[in-house]
Amino acid sequence: MMSLINLDLVISAVTSIANPVIKEKILRSETVIKLLQQFNLDPEHPPADFSGVYAYTLVEYGVGKPKAFLELFRQEAIKQAFRKALDHNNPSILLSEVDTFLDACTLGDEIRSLELDVRREVAAFATVFIEVAKRSRTPADVLMNQQIGSLHKRIAGIQEQLERLPTLEGIRTEIARLAAQNYPALTPTATENQCRAIALAQQMRGWFETLGYRLEKYEIWAEEYFEWIINVPVRRSYDRILVRGVAGEVRLSDVMALCQSVNQQKTDEGWLVSTRRISRAARDEVKKEENRHLDCFTFDELIDLDADFSGYLDWLEAEIKRRKIDQKYVPLACTKEEIDPVTKRRIGISRYEAEDGWIDGYIDLWLDDPAKEHISILGEFGTGKTWFVFHYAWTALQRYKDAQRRGVERPRLPLVITLRDFAKALNVENVLAGFFFTQHNIRLNSEVFDQLNRMGKLLLIFDGFDEMAAKVDRQQMINNFWELAKVVVPGSKVILTCRTEHFPEAKEGRALLNAELQASTNKLTGETPQFEVLELEKFNDEQIRQVLLYQAEEATVEQIMGNSQLLDLARRPVMTDLILEALPDIEAGKPIDMSRVYLYAVRHKMERDIKAERTFNSLADKLYFLCELSWEMLSTDQMSLNYRLFPERIRRLFGSVVQEEKDLDHWHYDMMAQTMLVRNADGDYTPAHRSLLEFFVAYKFAAELGALARDFTEVGQAQSGLDSSTASIDYTWSGYFSRQLDSTGCREVIAPLRQFKSEFLDKLRETFGKAKLTKAVIDLLLPMLDDNEPLIKIIEATRGRTEDEVNYVGGNAATLLVKLNKMVLEGRDLSHTVIIGADFTNTSLRCVNFTEANLAYSVFTKILGSVLTVAFSPDGKLFATGDSGGIVRFWEAATGKELLTCKGHNSWVNSVGFSQDGKMLASGSDDQTVRLWDISSGQCLKTFKGHTSRVRSVVFSPNSLMLASGSSDQTVRLWDISSGECLYIFQGHTGWVYSVAFNLDGSMLATGSGDQTVRLWDISSSQCFYIFQGHTSCVRSVVFSSDGAMLASGSDDQTVRLWDISSGNCLYTLQGHTSCVRSVVFSPDGAMLASGGDDQIVRLWDISSGNCLYTLQGYTSWVRFLVFSPNGVTLANGSSDQIVRLWDISSKKCLYTLQGHTNWVNAVAFSPDGATLASGSGDQTVRLWDISSSKCLYILQGHTSWVNSVVFNPDGSTLASGSSDQTVRLWEINSSKCLCTFQGHTSWVNSVVFNPDGSMLASGSSDKTVRLWDISSSKCLHTFQGHTNWVNSVAFNPDGSMLASGSGDQTVRLWEISSSKCLHTFQGHTSWVSSVTFSPDGTMLASGSDDQTVRLWSISSGECLYTFLGHTNWVGSVIFSPDGAILASGSGDQTVRLWSISSGKCLYTLQGHNNWVGSIVFSPDGTLLASGSDDQTVRLWNISSGECLYTLHGHINSVRSVAFSSDGLILASGSDDETIKLWDVKTGECIKTLKSEKIYEGMNITSVRGLTEVEKATLKTLGAVENREI
């Protein structure tokens, strides 16, 4: 049926729309839809006739256009010209008719007065018409072809693309692209060839016009071909060439027809052009002498006449072969975030590995998708970005050459454009001109490039955005990105590579590369292109093996694969070559770290490069030159230097010894032979890899500081012209190489170098102190330093100077110092010094005098204990934390800035929660109180008292009028917020209350308890109306479903139960867990339940059926906490394995493992918008994670020093303690002084033990290692690695030849002290091993575990001899009696059990503690047993009677460790209150209290500059003082 629509009415309706409306895209789309519906046009399915499509197009195109233009399209003559042009496959008819019409009528004058490009508007109208026509099918047709997109959105996108097209040729190219697709409404009988002919004609016309060729009036259009005549300028005249376009294959008959047309039209030449291919006969025919005026081309071959890329192709091929990428490339994996198109939040992640063809496979798909135009490839340094770029360019080049050889349509030509050499403020025209003209001598102007780009002929690859972006500030970087984005136009494909760590904040980097941050100038008009981001993954083991096998023998590869340090370094592709180069030194037993691998490799490379007959034949001179050149490149952001510029630099660096031309010639040849700088054909030198520059700069800094380690100094000592008879002396870096000629004209002879000494401050200010050190340089610099004193003297040299005189010298030196030794500055007088931008995090600054020092921009430790609980405010702007120090803190979510510190609790804060209006926060603590805090001021509004034991959980009612608290006193209390009164005490539970939860309307409260029940309480009556029974162990977690109809509970009985609220019945018992369930949580839609616990598995359950949908695995320790994202698509959890994991619910895949915590993760919370995740850990940090990128936005770090373990040395004169501050301390008993502090662990020290003769000490840590320390030297003798989780306990065997360690990885390892080898791994426990101990005769080993068992192992056979059962909670400590007849065990069930070794029976159960028993020890004579508990007491028991002799009070927090002196007269106890107490065993009295000083104890900050008052207050809390306080 024909669509009869009055165009006058359409124009009237369209022009009546107010202009402001059309500026908003959404409003414009809504307006268009309403107008279409007004004229009975279906917005999704246009009518299938010409008139209907024409009217539809007038609405889509016309909204916001001047009325005069719409009047033009209303004219019948224009409408008929449009129909004729399309029916005859000749779009140029329309443009010609429009010109004629405008010349002949007054409307033309009105339109021209608007100063708009008429032809452009006509072409834009035609483009919209084609797109509408493509959709003019039935809904069934549309669905069948899966064309489910919204039409008006698609057209809006096309119109926005057209707004980005600056030229008519660009619009013609876009029309050609659309015309290449069939559009049935236009020409129902049109063939595929006709559509191709239209596309070819449009591209050719655009190409000819871009080249400046004039088209004559002559045009022929037929079903299989079209003909034009073009005028090609030749000197002062032009050639007339007849062009015949053929959509299909050019055959011999086409050549004959061309010849006939050329003769008829009397042109100079004739060209046949095809999109497809040309037959052999046709090519042979035009080669004949009589046809020398004829030629035939594919369209690509036609382009070759004026765009010659052959020189570039030769360069690209040579560059790839030089890099050996064609031979040694190993496929790389990548990840890509999946973004919700509506919320713009990340909802998942895709990993592209072998099954998907790696990153190559994704880029192939991206190239084939016409909607995608730009992609950024991110990766850390050395992960293979440039490697991949040249590999993919090589792959694309082979495809291109193959198509070129076969004479078929070619794929895109890859153009690799490196950004390292361009100016700080980019101009894309200059970048392209530099690439085409300067680098590759390709004579293309910008118009020709633009046309090739729009026609889809190019693949643009910009490599190294980070190397350019690092030169500028944030806004200029954004401007530069958008400047490059100018080449992103319809039809283009652009790849950009960039270092991940370039961006100071991962979130900002993502936002920029996803085109979310706008430029301050040169913005793109209209809708931005579609941008994507991929991120390269580091090598896995198999990839490492593969790349090594390309370069080394199997035995060498296995040697590297077997070395964990080398394997970790080799995860970056850039390091594999260096490792192989350095292998001889590694095999010789030299130390291994990243800097030394560079050192060994660089030395071998330089030795190979040196030729004896050349001037620069010493390692030292070459090293100096490369260091200075690297510094110049990095500091000036000039990543390449032409050889012509080197003579001046050589003269400047080496003085008069190279003034003669022959010396420079020697240097020139020497440079051409070396391998660390790559020279191109133009003589430009660039580093083989940026990290080499960073290594040489780090070396230069270490030498200038006078702190270079001896093995690094050896390269500098390899100098020529030395007087070997003279004693070696110290030189400055610059002085050593400033050699002059002696009186005879020979290079002066100097004394050998002993070591480098520090440069003067003025010199350091221009190099080392020019800017804050980057992470890459710091990481390479630290292993090079072996002397603290020069750095200290440099800091002291800043005394009395101004900030401008020092720059970052003092701050950089201080940062390096404290990273090497966290205690090195203790007691130093640094008054009046200038220390700008230092990082003092977790550094001991005890008794440092900073009086009147300038500490601007320096970072210090915050006060923060183990973070036990985290909660976001309802608006997501704040989050709150509660920690083991009893402190509640408020933080700004956007910046990580600490806003308020709320003090009042005097013990652990276990739970925090915001009120619904976000104005208040409640906190529950081990101090038996609940506190209510004002969010705006941080003031404590009320303190709710009444509980008689720790408060484990607090929660506001939905209306925020009441607060519920659950406690270990077996009660739940309901508090009135306004009055502070306790409304009800819910009694009935006979065990600790672990969890409380309100239902949705606040009418009910559920509680889970250690008495194995769940209770449901009616708030109005305070009565318990249901007791849910069925669990057979304590209930740790309860939660209501979102509709309030069900309740879920997780228990230590290894089950989850679903309860029906209305009936009180158990709907399902969800079984599958093999250990206690710690956390349960419903998905936001209530369809699923997640559960996690000690079996290291998360299970997802279907609520309707009770079936386990799937299990999420990969954990190596307990799952402590679970939370769904607000949209329900992601599940986050915290674990005792120190990792936060994010799971995609739909794919069941782990999206991210968020690593960085060095202790258990106690709490995780999503922000209300789901964009940020906060995690709190026992490592005394809160980390904020960006969900979209998985990057850590902020680390909020603090400090406490719980004492986890104490032990006396064999003679009882010394006590060792292990602490949560990552240190081991030795204390002298008589003086109570701390003798020394052992540093090296990177997390809590959980256990310490002396060997039998007291010469060594072993320590086990949450960093998964055991360290062996020499008491006399305080040095670490060895680090035992192998455990995959915390090391909780260490023990020597009686003769000291072996060491046992128990770990959270559920194993016990036996180590040989002499060889440092692991002799045996004992397996059998199903949860953490908390304690290990040897029998007195050394034949057996006992272990206690969180699986509630004690196991007895045979040392000789490794077999488990016996398993002791009876405890009902974890076993935290085991110890043999001195005679070996009894084994004692302390447990979380609050008891100590004594077991008979001979019978395996329990002799006594010692009861009396009212909290966990974590540590036990026998007296030396075996008559007494001491036990330390979380109830803050130590108990002394008589072994023979089982009687408690004393209860020792004094600690104000959990007691973690107890130890007897060798004579049995003194008992030591270590506590979370940060003290060690010494007790008289006979009287039970406390003799002494040992307490380590606070981290900033006695630090004098009188009149210090550069710190805020809040920062000063924090420092004072950590021990700092001002004069008035001294």
UniProtKB/Swiss-Prot annotation:
Keywords: Repeat, WD repeat. WD repeats lie at residues 334-376, 862-901, 904-945, 946-985, 988-1027, 1030-1069, 1072-1111, 1114-1153, 1156-1195, 1198-1237, 1240-1279, 1282-1321, 1324-1363, 1366-1405, 1408-1447, 1450-1491. Residues 823-862 form the Pentapeptide repeat domain. It holds the Pfam family WD40. The keyword Repeat applies. PROSITE patterns: NACHT (PS50837), WD_REPEATS_1 (PS00678), WD_REPEATS_2 (PS50082), WD_REPEATS_REGION (PS50294). InterPro entries: 5peptide_repeat, G-protein_beta_WD-40_rep, NA-iREase1_dom, NACHT_NTPase, NNH, P-loop_NTPase, Quinoprotein_ADH-like_sf, WD40/YVTN_repeat-like_dom_sf. It comes from the Bacteria. PANTHER family: WD REPEAT DOMAIN 5B, WD40 REPEAT PROTEIN. This is Uncharacterized WD repeat-containing protein alr3466. It comes from Nostoc sp. (strain PCC 7120 / SAG 25.82 / UTEX 2576). The lineage of its organism: Bacteria, Bacillati, Cyanobacteriota, Cyanophyceae, Nostocales.
